[in-house]
UniProtKB/Swiss-Prot annotation:
Gene3D superfamilies attached to this UniProt entry: 3.30.590.20
Keywords noted in UniProt: ATP-binding, Ligase, Nucleotide-binding
Protein name in the entry: Putative glutamate--cysteine ligase 2-1
Reactions catalysed: L-cysteine + L-glutamate + ATP = gamma-L-glutamyl-L-cysteine + ADP + phosphate + H(+)
InterPro entries recorded: GCL_type2/YbdK_subfam, GCS2, Gln_synth/guanido_kin_cat_dom, YbdK
Purpose of the protein: ATP-dependent carboxylate-amine ligase which exhibits weak glutamate--cysteine ligase activity.
One of the GO biological process terms: modified amino acid biosynthetic process
Amino acid sequence: MVRKLGIEEELLLFDPESGEVVPAAPSVLKEFREHGPGRQRARAATDELDQELFRHQLETRTDPVRRAADALDQLVAARRTAGEAARAAGYAAGACGIVPLGGDRSVVSPNDRYRDMVDTYGEIARTGGTCGMHVHVDIGSDEEGVAVVDRIAPWLPVLVALAANSPYVEGRDSGYASWRAQVWARWPSAGPTEQFGSVAGYREVCRMLLDVGAARDPGMLYFDARLSTGQPTVEVRVCDVGTDPAVAVTIGALVRALVETAAEEWADGRPAAHWRAEALRAAHWRASRFGMADSLVHPLARGLRPARSVVAALVEAVEPALAAAGDLELVDVQLERAVNDNGATRQRAAFERTGSVRGVVDDVIARTEASWQDHDSHAGRL
């Protein structure tokens, strides 16, 4: 049976007049509860929209689904809900990996856990208001999940490059395609992991990180791929949020295919290829720095190859799983957009057109809002 997948996205809240972020999440969530779909369905706001670490952020999520088309419909619906609630409250929602221009990023959401994170981790937390996309994929057991995490690690930098959507920070070009990835890597529990080898090995590492305070709770074990807390999934956390939901679902399909392929290798008794953490970090840095604009580390050749050929190698490695899930055509059609024109490329093109990072913000907002407006005209088609 095809594994279910779910997608979480984090969005920024902007002042549409200045282009700066604003701590508007309480106002937007209030609008959603009182006047939006949350009130009409008599559902809690957290079912579709939720607060994040800072008040200039919102989180959206889909349900676990088997069909990529259903994931797209839900992802677009969640974006529409967030965007319309933001506009009704006088703001705008935008899908961007990091704050590109400025604004008030200091207001922590009213949550004891979030306040404790800032108290404990200081500047790492205070500058940690980034926006990612997380993909969840079903697993049959913790044993299978750890085997998957051990096997997919070398491929995750390819996803970093495809999803890169955060070149601008503090009104300037960072020089990176995904500056969010570098900011996120500051957390003491974040980043790629060497092989755990077993559930016991995984739990031992988790316990040590918790014991020394590198994470305050299991939800703060920010491995690039981890076993989810409270649900039987592997969660991949390496991607920037992007403006194009079809590309997001395509990346979700690739993650699902990676999980399925790795699980089959484990079930067949094939060992995981060993990678040192230093090599994985170098591959991640390369993907974050250049995105799709230069060479990437090829997980099979273990050397630099043109980014396009590394993406092709990923698709080839998981092609049977993509076909079995009915996702091969989706990937063939949509992946070309991420290869040729990912978020970082679009943001830099917007800067070239407008001559300002404010113009980049306007473009991010416009593309984010178009992502549900365009979908309405051809719903269900990928």
